[in-house]
């Protein structure tokens, strides 16, 4: 469940008048050490594990971490197995079962749920050079996709329009918290200076946890993810990374990059939340802006196809809002409020270089007359399969 405790805890303070918020960031010398001391994970001596990772293991024995999306539609689960050969593709990987009654996906009397491997990545956490991360989708006892398996429907849509070469680039925003739910680096008995100096910022008073962010970049590149970049965001302790452009691989990559981020954060004793509005008041929310294009849009004169797609999106606004967060719009109600660089959840809008609209056309695209559109409505905790499936079915399949 997405963390909102920080927002609830500080709601009264953070809606105070701006004049009361103009105070210097106060961080005690012991804040970070106390912060980490409160995390059970950082209490463990990491050097002990390294002793065992230095042991030689049989070359033909491979550790495979199977990942899947649980019944919440936003959280990742995993379990490990050892394989007897090095897999070269997902076809070499066996299906597996797990207890779906413990992941909100089945009832106890018929709880065996099936994992089907769909994508394979190098594992930055395991010691073996052949160890892998296996992204799976999930199927109930009757063989049908579980309710949280949005990948199956998206794959079916992609199969129908693959000749149009759809690309997706996803901008994943997230917020770092301490284990008590307070944003990382925020003073214990107050709050930072108002937004302004933090976006793409530099300096110890403006940027927090850059080490964690840079570790995430390297781990994702090692894994084979199409990682495009990263930056500090508008709210302190908020960051963004970008995935793509690609087809369904962009969605696979986003889920695996979320997993890698959370695993690295475990080691730092930091909590990652993808909640779209973790802090109440005059603080930016978090989204997953989704950039979309087709072969026609990227060609000369593609702006016409872009505008046609926007027109189709304008007619299916309600459908997209329901698809753009795991609670069918309830999470985005807190974020899409018509201010703080968001549009209104109740009304579709678009414009060139405008960040207060539902769909933005970047100025460079408008100038070039070709490129892509940016759908700014998806929440940071969205399922990218659901988002991209809705876009494809509206814009390309005319559903």
Curated annotation (Swiss-Prot):
Coiled coil regions in record: none
Signal sequence bounds: none
Domain GS beta-grasp: start-end pairs: 62-143
PROSITE patterns in alphabetical order: GLNA_1, GLNA_ATP, GS_BETA_GRASP, GS_CATALYTIC
EC number: 6.3.1.2
This protein's UniProt keywords: ATP-binding, Ligase, Mitochondrion, Nucleotide-binding, Transit peptide
Subcellular location: Mitochondrion
SUPFAM superfamilies named in the record: Glutamine synthetase, N-terminal domain, Glutamine synthetase/guanido kinase
GO molecular function ontology, one term from the record: ATP binding
Gene3D superfamilies assigned: Glutamine synthetase, N-terminal domain (3.10.20.70), Glutamine synthetase/guanido kinase, catalytic domain (3.30.590.10)
Main location: mitochondrion
Catalysed reactions, as listed in the record: L-glutamate + NH4(+) + ATP = L-glutamine + ADP + phosphate + H(+)
Transit peptide, residues from-to: 1-27
InterPro entries: Gln_synt_N, Gln_synt_N_sf, Gln_synth/guanido_kin_cat_dom, Gln_synth_cat_dom, Gln_synth_gly_rich_site, Gln_synth_N_conserv_site, Glutamine_Synthetase
Residue span, GS catalytic domain: 150-399
GO biological process: glutamine biosynthetic process; L-glutamine biosynthetic process; phagocytosis
Enzyme superclass (EC): ligase
GO cellular component: cytoplasm; mitochondrion
Listed PANTHER family: GLUTAMINE SYNTHETASE, GLUTAMINE SYNTHETASE 1, MITOCHONDRIAL
Family: Belongs to the glutamine synthetase family.
Record text on subunit structure and interactions: Homooctamer.
Listed name of the protein: Glutamine synthetase 1, mitochondrial
Designated gene of the protein: Gs1
């Amino acid at each position: 469940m997405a963390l909102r405790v920080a927002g609830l805890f500080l709601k009264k303070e953070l809606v105070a008048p701006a004049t009361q918020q103009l105070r210097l960031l106060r961080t005690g010398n012991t804040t970070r050490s106390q912060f980490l001391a409160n995390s059970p994970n950082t209490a463990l001596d990491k050097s002990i594990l390294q002793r065992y990772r230095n042991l030689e293991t049989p070359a033909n024995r491979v550790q495979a971490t199977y990942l899947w999306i649980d019944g919440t539609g936003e959280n990742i689960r995993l379990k490990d197995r050892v394989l007897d050969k090095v897999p070269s593709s997902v076809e070499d990987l066996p299906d597996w079962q797990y207890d779906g009654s413990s992941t909100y996906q089945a009832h106890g009397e018929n709880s065996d749920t099936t994992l089907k491997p769909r994508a394979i990545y190098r594992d930055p956490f395991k010691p073996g050079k052949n160890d892998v991360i296996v992204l799976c989708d999930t199927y109930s006892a009757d063989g049908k996709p579980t309710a949280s398996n949005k990948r199956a429907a998206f794959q079916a849509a992609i199969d129908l329009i693959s000749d149009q070469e759809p690309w997706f680039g996803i901008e994943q925003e997230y917020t770092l918290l301490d284990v008590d739910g307070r944003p990382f680096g925020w003073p214990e008995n107050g709050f930072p200076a108002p937004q302004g100096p933090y976006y793409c910022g530099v300096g110890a008073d403006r940027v927090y946890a850059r080490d964690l962010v840079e570790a995430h970049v390297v781990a994702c590149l090692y894994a084979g993810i199409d990682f495009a970049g990263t930056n500090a965001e508008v709210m302190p302790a908020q960051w963004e990374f970008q995935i793509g452009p690609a087809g369904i691989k962009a969605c696979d990559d986003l889920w695996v990059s979320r997993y890698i981020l959370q695993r690295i954060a475990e080691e730092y004793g930091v909590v990652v939340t993808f909640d779209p509005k973790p802090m109440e008041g005059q603080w930016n929310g978090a989204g997953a802006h989704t950039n979309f294009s087709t072969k026609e849009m990227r060609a000369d004169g593609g702006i016409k196809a872009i505008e046609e797609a926007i027109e189709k999106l304008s007619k299916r606004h309600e459908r997209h809002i329901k698809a753009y967060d795991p609670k069918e719009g309830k999470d985005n109600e807190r974020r899409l409020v018509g201010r703080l660089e968001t549009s209104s959840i109740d009304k579709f809008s678009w414009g060139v270089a405008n960040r207060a609209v539902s769909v933005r056309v970047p100025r460079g695209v408008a100038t070039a007359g070709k490129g892509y559109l940016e759908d700014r409505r998806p929440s940071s905790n969205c399922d990218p399969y659901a988002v991209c499936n809705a876009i494809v079915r509206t814009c390309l399949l005319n559903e």
